[in-house]
Amino acid sequence: MKQFLLGLLLTLIMSTATAHPQDNLTPEGLMHYYVQVLNDENLPALQDVYHFPHLKLVAGKLTVIDDPKIPVIDIDGLKKSGWKYSTIKNVKVLSQGDNAALIELNFSRFDAQGKELLNQTTFYNLTKNKGYWQILSIHSMGSLAGVKTK
């Protein structure tokens, strides 16, 4: 019995050690989590939300980020634009399969006084290759402060 309990405890510890906050999230839930960790300026959590290689198509310019050590979002650049926080106005799952989803996200960015700086609709391709949803690519029709492009 002691060996069984010890084995069970080790299994729980190992599964917790490899757990990701987005493990049980739906594609829509991932988008809410994404904006939450962005607002928290939690760079490690943000990087874990992205799948690498990561693709961005912003205002017609394609950027590929291969290295997960390179931040996808430039928080300092975002702050220089006056950004303090973002909110989601609408999330729509346009298509979803077992390991892929296409999301339409309408969001706003605000300054510290609550003034809306930007309202935009952006499209996200999600993948579940690692067992949990991640953002594989972002497609934006306009330029976005804080979004790295080469």
Segments the model singles out, each with a brief description of its role:
Residues 55-65:
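A short gly/proline-enriched turn/hairpin at secondary-structure junctions
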Residues 34, 46-47, 54, 103, ...:
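Hydrophobic pocket/interface hotspot
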Residues 50, 60-61, 97, 105-109, ...:
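A mature extracytoplasmic/lumenal domain signature
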Residues 35-43, 51-55, 76, 80:
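Sec-exported extracytoplasmic/periplasmic mature domains
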Residues 1-4:
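Positively charged n-region of N-terminal signal peptides that target proteins for export
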Residues 11-44, 48, 68:
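Short, low-complexity N-terminal intrinsically disordered segments enriched in polar/charged residues
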Residues 119-149:
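Short beta-strand edge/turn micro-motifs at domain boundaries
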Residues 70-115:
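Surface-exposed, charged secondary-structure patches
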